[in-house]
Amino acid sequence: KNGWTCLVVADCTGHGIPGAFMTLISSTLLDRISSIKDLSHPDTILNDLDEFLQKSLSLDDTHQETDFGLDAGVCCFSLDAKIFRYSGAKMNLYQKTDQGVVEIKGDKKSLGYDIKEHPLNFKVFECALNEKPSSFFVFSDGVTDQVGGEKKLMYGKKRVLHQIREAVDVKAAVNNIVADVERYQGVNKRRDDLTLFGFAL
């Protein structure tokens, strides 16, 4: 829209029906936001999504907390303007360059769940898109929190970042992470959905 592309990675509350319910609502609201709002500011998109969620879940009427909500990361970029922006609601971004992997932390607040004062004032990370491409990765805590190994510990962020650093490209990184998490999990129960998104610009 107007030369800007928006990518959203979201991790909704719950499993089964509650998770599907939040996924459907959030997807519908994001479609609405994309049709009526500017797509160049990820912080505004997160703020608008939280406002619409409050109305959809009737939080502004009941003033009560709910178990329905989500964590999300929003990437906005323009190939014409050569600008990339990111804002996160309890979700971080990882940028791989020739110098290594850099963690861009999102804000420590989720969307939904309870009534909030707006605007939420999410931080915005911005960088220029150079001729030499960068790789970007966003993933949910289902990846890092998977229990496995001999000591039945969580997979952890360090293992994810190791796979990103060692991979030759984005596709290899994603495939290697998924395969390594499954290997690490072994016979242990899957704790959560695995959401992992990588792309190069």
Regions found by a protein language model. Give the residues of each.
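Exposed aromatic-hydrophobic patches
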Residues: 123-129
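Catalytic core of PPM/PP2C metal-dependent serine/threonine phosphatase domains
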Residues: 1-5, 17-98, 105, 119-122, ...
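Sensory beta-strand/linker motifs that couple input domains to effectors
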Residues: 8
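DG-centered beta-turn motif at the end of beta-strands
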Residues: 11, 91, 140-142, 193
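Active-site-proximal, acidic helix/loop segment immediately C-terminal to a metal-coordinating Asp/Glu
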Residues: 16-40, 102, 130-188
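Residues that scaffold the ATP/ADP-binding catalytic core of kinase and kinase-like folds
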Residues: 96, 114, 146-147
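Short coil/turn segments at secondary-structure boundaries
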Residues: 177, 192-195
